[in-house]
Swiss-Prot record:
Organism field: Chlorobium luteolum (strain DSM 273 / BCRC 81028 / 2530) (Pelodictyon luteolum)
Cofactor annotation remark: Binds 2 Mg(2+) ion per subunit.
Active-site residues, as the UniProt record annotates them: 7, 67, 140
Annotated binding of Mg(2+) 1, by residue: 7, 140
Keyword DNA damage: yes
Main location: cytoplasm
PANTHER family: CROSSOVER JUNCTION ENDODEOXYRIBONUCLEASE RUVC
Residues holding Mg(2+) 2: 67
Gene: ruvC
CDD domains, sorted: RuvC
Listed name of the protein: Crossover junction endodeoxyribonuclease RuvC
GO biological process: DNA recombination; DNA repair
Length: 191
């Protein structure tokens, strides 16, 4: 199964494509669509739609995972984000993809074991789960990859994690995995 995770934004939209062909997670592609703030909002939505349509044609995912909308202090930003989400959802439906939406807290819980994890902790776990040599940048990308991984964990459940560096066997859960991989643990920022 191939899942496309999307972290939507009107100026920066992250994407991550993850597969589980052989029972292991594999990152197929990831990146960020950086949009020109000088263009109109509808023009940026059109660029997102076209770029993701090309990506879907190329990687042929079966599912699309997208972050749910949240309302912060800036209502105008929330409305613009909602329009981007709507375009991405419409594209997924048009292309016949199974669509799942996840709240940020649910994604963090699925990937790190903590619903209140920082973006840096999510990035660290994404890197560990996929056995990557370095953390993909920027955080919009790791958030999108985390959305794809969350979808796989919620809908497939029995996918193996790569072995932690220096371990001879798979651990008995997240606590042991983190203990065996101290170099992958990212501490939350102190305020």
């Amino acid at each position: 199964m191939i899942v496309l995770g999307i972290d939507p934004g009107s100026l920066s939209t992250g994407y991550g494509v993850v597969s589980t062909d052989d029972g292991r997670y594999r990152l197929l592609e990831c990146g960020v669509l950086r949009l020109n703030p000088g263009k109109s909002h509808p023009a940026r939505i059109g660029e997102i739609f076209e770029a993701l349509d090309c990506l879907i044609s190329r990687v042929q995912p079966g599912r699309l995972s997208i972050e749910t909308a949240f309302v912060g202090r800036n209502v105008q930003s929330a409305l613009k984000l909602g329009q981007v989400r709507g375009a991405v959802i419409a594209l997924g439906v048009h292309r016949g993809l199974m669509l799942h939406e996840y709240a940020p807290r649910e994604v963090k819980l699925a990937v790190t074991g903590r619903g209140g994890a920082s973006k840096e902790q999510v990035a660290g776990m994404v890197t560990a789960m996929l056995g990557l040599g370095s953390v993909p940048k920027p955080l919009d990308v790791t958030d999108a990859i985390a959305l794809a991984l969350c979808d796989m964990l919620r809908n497939e459940g029995n996918v193996s994690l790569p072995k932690a560096k220096g371990s001879s066997r798979r651990g008995n859960g997240w606590a042991e995995f983190v203990k065996a991989s101290p170099d992958l643990v990212v501490e939350p920022l102190k305020h």
